[in-house]
Amino acid sequence: MRKYLFCEAGFVEKANWQPNCWINIECPDAADFHFLQEQLKVPQSFLNDIADTDERPRTDTEGNWLLTILRIPVQTPDSKVPYATVPIGIITNNELVISVCYHSTEMLPDFIEHTQRKGI
């Protein structure tokens, strides 16, 4: 799922991307990969690193791109442990912020909703 978010009074979703927006991608599909690699020219190695479920938090650079990998919680209802952590990649250059997570999360939608409620 791909969303284009713009900072106004909170993050506002719009139909198309433009420079200086946040592109949030959860559970990317083939069209998302094509968009990231062909249109935006995001390095393939960044997407491969984010896909590694054992990837540790770190930063990396390639050209004018910066990759920051963090680990965020996701619910695991079929496990004895209620939460596990998964990698999320924050990819930036001079005009874009792109977040890519191969799992559906509650954290980012909650963050977006919070910014809208607070108007920040």
Regions flagged by a language model, labelled:
Residues 1-120:
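Peripheral, non-transmembrane regulatory/ligand-interaction domains of membrane transport proteins
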